[in-house]
Amino acid sequence: MSQLKEIQEEITRHEQQIVIARQKLKDVEKTVEADPDDVNKSTLQSRRAAVSALEDKLADFKRQLADLVSSQKMGEKPVDPTGLEPDDHLKERSSLRYGNVLDVNAIDIDEPSGQTADWFSIGQYITGFALAIILKALYMLSTRGRQTIKENKGTRIRFKDDSSYEEINGIRRPKHLYVSMPTAQSTMKADELTPGRFRTIVCGLFPAQIMYRNIISPVMGVIGFSFFVKDWPEKIEEFLIKPCPFLKKSGPSKEEDFLVSNDAYLLGREKALRESHLAEIDDLIDLAASGDPTPPDSIKSPQAPWVFACRPDRCPPTCIYIAGMAELGAFFSILQDMRNTIMASKTVGTAEEKLKKKSSFYQSYLRRTQSMGIQLDQRIILLFMTEWGSDIVNHFHLGDDMDPELRTLAQSLIDQKVKEISNQEPLKI
């Protein structure tokens, strides 16, 4: 009953506030009619927003009251001796107990979860902002991503920065960058920004700026990304001139050497990708070419690997038709799975890392990238792994275990002290 009383009091209080707010709104409307300057117009907008917010809150409290009264009535109904709910269609009770009621009112079946994003609309939205707020938001959603997402789950957050503003009637106002933080039950619109879509589009549009500022996601940092991208132009050039095991050599000549090189294989891959083009992604690439963005034009570009520095969950659409780029992202995903498997096999590592015995970065990346209309060439991933796999695995950050002699000495000191102060068995360090 106390909860019912609290809701009724809130309804009464909000009704009183609405009466006052509506009166203030009428007064401002009269003032604007008499003197329609910018200050009065701004006040009018804020009064309207205040009334709207109060009406929304009142409607919410009335819904809560209706739900509470309904649940109390249900509780007062006599319990069926069979244990069946009154609207259950079964004649005899199931062996399963009744679980939670899942409210699906908020779900829009015309916009099902997991649909392909509208990358052109998202790209247009992002390129309308100053670079400073974009990179700061990227930092918050990559380098500090886990904490930001955890604190704001289930809400639509706004990023604000002095570099991002718009002028309306001569008044400068903040231009917020909106990003949705969905839960597992959320349904996303095609043009709605989520952390994954944001990282994907920004990494694809501004890799040179990310490289210059050295913005790297922790997930990429621990697989040795900084080591891998060092001297990238030389590294990729060495890879491209090597003979490809999937192309057969017919005779000794310089021209023949090129025709059986990894470079020739990637050229063949690029021809195959031309048949997979989607108009929406082509429009996005044209949009990027006409403005400030710096997407790579080839896998040889110095900024090419930096497309994946903030761990986008798929290959960014701006470079999906560049031979080898989607496969390079898949290579990084496999490295993340490999490191997680190593961490799960060790005695060190966080509890979360030990739980990740089945890591699925690669499967997730593959599924999301292929939803954009291309099939990955796994032979290119194999070439990358053969060329660089051994070297980069040696640069994984694995959280060094304690030296055996140091562990033995520390344990002996623990045992000695515990015996002095307690009769309990000492724990192992």
Swiss-Prot record:
Subcellular localization is given as:
Virion; Host cytoplasm, Host perinuclear region; Host Golgi apparatus, Host cis-Golgi network
Positions of region (Interaction with host UBE2I/UBC9): 188-191
Region entry RdRP binding, spans: 1-50
Q: Where is the segment annotated Homomultimerization? A: 1-79, 100-125, 373-421
Q: Where is this motif: YxxL?
A: 178-181
Q: How does it assemble?
A: Homotrimer. Homomultimer. Homomultimerizes and binds to viral genomic RNA to form the nucleocapsid. Interacts with host MAP1LC3B; this interaction participates to the protection of Gn from virus-triggered autophagy. Interacts with host SNAP29; this interaction participates to the protection of glycoprotein N from virus-triggered autophagy. Interacts (via N-terminus) with host RPS19; this interaction probably mediates the loading of the 40S ribosomal subunit on viral capped mRNA during N-mediated translation initiation. Interacts with the viral RdRp. Interacts with host SUMO1 (via N-terminus).
Protein's name in the database: Nucleoprotein
Q: Give the species this sequence originates from.
A: Tula orthohantavirus (TULV)
Q: What is the lineage of its organism?
A: Viruses, Riboviria, Orthornavirae, Negarnaviricota, Polyploviricotina
